[in-house]
Amino acid sequence: MVLSLQTLAKKVLAGQRPTKCHPHFLKCYGLWWHNGPMIFDQNQKKIWSPIFTDGVHINAALVKAAAENNYDLIKLFTEWGANIDYSLLSVNTERTRDLCRELGAKEQLKQEEVLYYFNTIKRNLTSSNIILCHEVFSHNPILETINRTKLRGIIYEQLEALMENTDILSELLTKYWYGIAIEFNLTKAIHYFYQRYVHLHQWRLMYALFYNNVCDLHELYAKEKIRMDMDEMLKWACRKNYNYLTIYYCCIVLGADINQAMFHSIQFYNIGNMFFCIDLGANAIEEGKTLALQKDKSFIASLLSINCYSMNDSLSLKETDPEVIKRMLKDYHSKNMSIAHKYYIKHGFNDI
């Protein structure tokens, strides 16, 4: 497409730092959005505005402009290279739909196209983008028209054990975006969800435990005073293998029973967690072996039959700062797992 002189001028002006441009000129050129200057980086194809402080891809910005029925920006973003078909994800009036058709949009998106655009937009893992995705998609009727099984599959990949058996799509999607914010520690987005969804405070605590996010766990438990039964917390920490950070925090910082953490790990068949608990001082080995046999987990019972496990004395049991805990356990390899592995290589487990 050949750009007009006016469009080129806007493109150049949008690439300048806002301090170099008088607000009057930005407003005249339509580069004032959300009560502040709008910036465009043509190399990254990203837009910044007061609500998009981390920047969003121009296609995502187009989705927002269409949702707001901002005709000037729909035209401008399309001229700057946005795919006009993305506007169909959020168009909500006939007048806006007619404009998008004039600019080349399809009559409607196919199911696979909706899912493709959905997956493409969410890839930009910034607070600005995840908040935008939540606002655009969590109550969007266009998602009601696509294959529910496929969409639930996408959500399950993120939530796993925290996926609820509900048909209320908006609830699932809210937790989906919230979960992404927690997993990738998107602090502005986390604060956004925390302020708006008070009923999800305990769910966020469960998510932090399950996804080994010790910083968020500390934030919720020590600072926000969010509470739940300690044994339930242990279960969520032990449910996913190699959750060393949240197991350490629960047992060493909060004082949860390390043997109980080992038992939960055995029940979930998470061998990495089990050995880490032994590293931390779990010593109810015979009880653990009995539990493994009761739960028909013979391989774990065989592992626990080796009589040479002990606490890892080199592992500090005094840390309470989540950042220090993260650094300490970043590349941690279990001492007792190494012992079991060497035994297996040398003897096998057939004779145990």
Swiss-Prot record:
Induction: Expressed in the early phase of the viral replicative cycle. Plays a role in virus cell tropism, and may be required for efficient virus replication in macrophages. In addition, inhibits IFN-beta-induced IFN-stimulated genes (ISGs) transcription. Mechanistically, degrades host STAT1 and STAT2 through apoptosis and ubiquitin-proteasome pathways respectively. It is found in: Host cytoplasm. The keyword Iron does not apply. Keywords: Early protein, Host cytoplasm. The lineage of its organism: Viruses, Varidnaviria, Bamfordvirae, Nucleocytoviricota, Pokkesviricetes. GO terms for cellular component: host cell cytoplasm. GO terms for biological process: taxis. Its main location: host cell. This is Protein MGF 360-9L. Interacts with host STAT1; this interaction mediates STAT1 degradation through apoptosis. Interacts with host STAT2; this interaction mediates STAT2 degradation through the proteasome. Belongs to the asfivirus MGF 360 family.
